[in-house]
Amino acid sequence: MKEDRQDLTTGSIWGKMLFFSIPLVLTNFLQVLFNMADIAGIGQFAGSLSLGAVGSTTTLVTLFTGFLIGMGGGTNVLVARFFGAKDKESTIKTIHTALLVSMAAGMIVLIFGLLFSKGILELLNTKEELLDGAVLYIRIYFLGMPAMALYNFGNAVCSAFGDTKKPLYYLGAAGIVNIVLNLFFVIVCKMDVAGVAAASIISQYLSAFLILRALVKVGGDYALRLSKLRFDKRMAGYLIQIGLPAGLQNGIFQVANLFIQAGVNTFDAIMVAGNSAAANADALLYDSMAAFYTACGSFMGQNYGAGKRKRVRNSYLVSLAYSFGIGTIGGIALVIFGRQFLGLFTNDPAVVDAGMKRLTIMGFSYGFSAFMDSAIAASRALGKSVIPTVIVIIGSCIFRMVWVNTVFAYFKTIPSLYLLYIFSWGITAVVEIIYWVHVYRNTKIG
């Protein structure tokens, strides 16, 4: 990986960030496609009950995977900062401490899932006929959480070094294995829900193995070495200070989304189905935009470490421009070609019409989320994670719950529900940007 490391402290930010982010966009896009393939496979070959069982675990799975991804963000920020500062000792300490922290986080999530998944699924009102299959799926799936934590660790380190290609290659290989094993376990072995979960964890351990192998083989002083595995309390504190709030934020968003889903569920089955189909656009656009938030952390981290104040600011502005552009252009494209997009998930014209109500509002809203998320990423890149998390919890989570129980409860229309997104993004963005400007002005850089 030595030849793949990039110095993000020199050259054109526009060009470097674009080429840095393209593999990240493709990585996130592949992940969405593989998840869709999982759902399609079990729906086609295992029946509606199995599909419902797997689908009923989505919120729980997203909550914990989001937590692990957020924890990886702390690794990305710190490694990039020390690497940019040419501080080898701190970089090495951070990498090896982050590996131990990631392993611990993965094991904690695994144990929690095995012990409490059934109770949580019951609290989420999982239908009785789906509960046994859902519990079986989630308990097998959670066996892969340590691997997911390790892959996110490796991905964060690679991104901090400016290498976004290897994670793409490894995820692509693991995703193909996942699809093949899915079909084999479900069609040939008749393993149903257990087969889908088993395929997922095998592919997760494969991707973790590949990325850890790359870090072991890296040239120079930054290679992973068992002899260097030490738990540095100071570095662990920094990692948790940045990563834990981000992980908790991802989880709390899922709680807020439950209130939104409850609002959708007050409409008829056609509208619920249309919402589900249209919601597939969220992952495509959010994950594409998220690539530039990761880039923001890596670019700002390296330049922060290098003491280049102006490039720190410009890295934030460029990532904001790119993410806003993708969200806006992609959203408008979904409005124009929305019926064709929804046709990938349903042949029912009524469901397509219902889905277009969501897509039309969301299509013109996606881009505005960039102002909120870019500011959050920028604050975390400067080591400030707690306050941005508190702001987003109040502005985008609690605000949404209040909106559902006031504005939506009064009007009881689909537009009055979906408009909460752009209003919550706008309000939160204003506060997040003000906070970032304050942090930037008061942070000693260089």
Segments predicted by a language model, with ranges:
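Short alpha-helical transmembrane segments in multi-pass integral membrane proteins
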Residues: 1-21, 79-144, 188-244, 300-365, ...
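Hydrophobic/aromatic residues in alpha-helical transmembrane segments
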Residues: 22, 38, 75, 116-117, ...
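Transmembrane helix-bundle signature of multi-pass secondary active exporters and lipid flippases
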Residues: 24-77, 141-148, 237-302, 323-330, ...
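Helix-loop interface residues and adjacent transmembrane-helix termini in multi-pass membrane transporters
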Residues: 33-36, 45-48, 82-85, 160-161, ...
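Small-residue-rich hydrophobic transmembrane alpha-helices
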Residues: 51-111, 148-167, 274-332, 336-338, ...
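Hydrophobic transmembrane alpha-helices of multi-pass small-molecule transporters
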Residues: 63-66, 178-182, 208-212, 284-287, ...
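Short runs within selected transmembrane alpha-helices of multi-pass transporters and secretion channels
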Residues: 72, 141-159, 167-175, 196-211, ...
